[in-house]
């Protein structure tokens, strides 16, 4: 019987299934960070349990670490406690960790693939919503809660119920100026933030196949914003080429065996999906969110929608509340919206490809950050991304134009460190969530691609990067 990619990943990890469908799954890799792991480790200590499979875990501090000068450590006592606690727990249990001043440190969903700890055919979990990122490698990856983090540490298994299968098929050539971020925002705009609820989404079609691994990770990263449990892309040569030679990847004869095994992780011809959604890539334009949910998105050449035209009273109320919070009027052209701050970073868009795309726009415009922009910051996703960008001179492109070039971390995506918006400030952000207060109490977030964020920094408002040439 023909199987989907999700079916194969699920079936190869079943330990036991109850009559009601509840399944005990084996977990190949757990990624840990400082926010959702302390209680899990404490639970192990209280129960006097060891970590079942130490080598299956990899840890890094990312949420609370400062992105400015780290020579004096972490100033905030709560943030310092969380980071110090992860350090102590990893030392106590023997878990591999990239500490704050390790060049390999970075955002957990960037360092996993970067190190080759994310591999095709794996089940991967982390106490973090955007674990779906790793599905770009033909893996089953999703976020879990703190009690589940403890369960995986203790047993290397997890109780789950199987999701339904959804295929999101994007065909055609992506227009100039459009990126993976625009693809996934367009998908969420089409199906809504509840469109994927109860499903695992496979992203397929010629447009997805043409993406780099960085682009595929961006798309899978935001599967959770479409309501899905997981997002994934089939394994192909692009996947294999990206992984070869990375530190955690098999070598020699084991590499050849692994590649042969990995190539099975794609949907069979004739595999049945519970739902299929199709998009024409040629119709996608640069996207900008206008509200307080990723589904509240429109094209750069569009306008802020008018709630009065919405027939659904629930949606209309949500739109009215969002516009009030965002301080926007219906029918406002998106290009006329001015911004106060720029954030280029996050597990969605802080890889080297993203940094290059933003730097290209800055260099093309050949001007400094607009006078109305109070802060424009670039936060690489890892120390290795930062080092690569600096070797290419990209840091100087940004700093010469008035951007701040920072140390790696989650940063302004969720404002758990000192990087945040003040009340009323408007930000063009390459992150994944534009909820109320996400980037700081009263802050107003517009989600865009790195190129769009860079252009907004220079112009002081949103612009159509397709016009840049």
From Swiss-Prot:
EC number, UniProt record: 4.2.1.33
Record-level GO BP terms: L-leucine biosynthetic process
Functional pathway: Amino-acid biosynthesis; L-leucine biosynthesis; L-leucine from 3-methyl-2-oxobutanoate: step 2/4
Transmembrane segments: none
Record's catalysed reaction(s): (2R,3S)-3-isopropylmalate = (2S)-2-isopropylmalate
Chain sites annotated for binding [4Fe-4S] cluster: 347, 410, 413
S-S bonds: none
Isomerase among keywords: no
Cofactors named for this entry: [4Fe-4S] cluster
Binding note for cofactor: Binds 1 [4Fe-4S] cluster per subunit.
Gene Ontology terms, MF aspect: 3-isopropylmalate dehydratase activity; 4 iron, 4 sulfur cluster binding; metal ion binding
PROSITE patterns: ACONITASE_1, ACONITASE_2
Biological function: Catalyzes the isomerization between 2-isopropylmalate and 3-isopropylmalate, via the formation of 2-isopropylmaleate.
NCBIfam families: leuC, PRK05478.1, PRK12466.1
Record-stated family: Belongs to the aconitase/IPM isomerase family. LeuC type 1 subfamily.
Entries under HAMAP family matching the protein: LeuC_type1 (MF_01026)
Subunit structure: Heterodimer of LeuC and LeuD.
Protein name: 3-isopropylmalate dehydratase large subunit
UniProt lineage: Bacteria, Pseudomonadati, Pseudomonadota, Betaproteobacteria, Burkholderiales
